[in-house]
Design a protein with these regions (language model features):
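Short Asp/Glu-rich motifs
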Residues: 52, 162-163, 170
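C-terminal helix-cap and adjacent tail motif
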Residues: 5, 12, 174-201
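A generic local secondary-structure boundary/capping motif
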Residues: 64-67, 140, 164-167
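Short, well-ordered secondary-structure micro-motifs
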Residues: 60, 87-90, 163, 186-190
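Small-aliphatic-rich amphipathic alpha-helix that forms the alpha element of a beta-alpha
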Residues: 31-35, 76, 98, 109-164
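A glycine-rich helix N-cap at a beta->alpha junction
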Residues: 68-83, 167-188
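N-terminal amphipathic, basic helical "cap/leader" segment at the start of enzyme domains
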Residues: 1-95, 201
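Mobile, glycine-enriched helix-loop/loop "lid" segments at the mouths of ligand-binding/catalytic clefts
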Residues: 93-108
Length: 201
């Protein structure tokens, strides 16, 4: 699919067919999603794939009962890590090895990244959400390329989600993304596309 067609074709789908999404497809989508850009290439995202019926019901509880969480065969919880330096060793070693930086530049960059650990938590939440949202958007395009529908969701109780799924400290739930094959009569697929503000504005 041409990229323009892909962008214009993607919809936020709320009604899903009663069809499973196989592990191979999910992994292929995730492999492409992680090519998204991120601050310093630190890739702070993590993905929790929620597919078991009982677990989707638990997730629906913390998502204010929204039906698409259990209608879709899979919902991804997209997390951002609050520790900016979690992957700094591998990231900088790779950049030195491939010629993007010399050792001195890598050392200076490491110092800057490690200093970010001292930022207030609210600032680190904003930092991780920015990069993680880019990966989530890439994920939705990768899914659509394969005929898989998605819907990003910001409506959920983050604290309740962390408690319900025993999420370790340092992981911020950024969004949910439902994923599956759209129902044949899904309004989001059959009706004309919703209004978009013109670029001229």
């Amino acid at each position: 699919m041409e990229f323009t067609d892909l962008v214009e074709d993607r919809r936020s789908v709320h009604d899903y067919a009663d069809a499973d999404l196989d592990r191979e497809t999910i992994e292929a989508i995730l492999r492409e999603a992680v090519y998204a850009p991120s601050s310093y290439n630190l890739q702070p995202w993590e993905f929790l794939v929620v597919g078991e019926d009982a677990n989707r019901e638990r997730l629906q509880e913390v998502a204010y009962g929204q039906p698409q969480v259990t209608d879709a065969p899979v919902t991804l919880v997209v997390f951002g890590r609050l520790d900016p330096a979690a992957h700094v060793d591998r990231v900088l070693a790779d950049q030195v090895e491939k010629g993007y930086r010399d050792e001195a530049s890598a050392a200076a960059t490491r110092e800057s990244i490690e200093a970010m650990r001292e930022y207030p938590e609210a600032e680190r939440r904003v930092w991780t959400a920015k990069s993680t949202a880019l990966a989530a958007m890439s994920l939705m395009f990768a899914a659509r390329e394969r005929g898989v529908a998605t819907c990003p969701m910001g409506g959920f109780d983050a604290e309740a989600l962390v408690e319900e799924f025993a999420v370790p400290d340092g992981y911020e739930p950024v969004m949910l993304v439902t994923m599956g094959y759209a129902a044949e009569d899904a309004d989001d697929e059959t009706l004309p596309r919703k209004f978009r503000r013109p670029v001229e504005e």
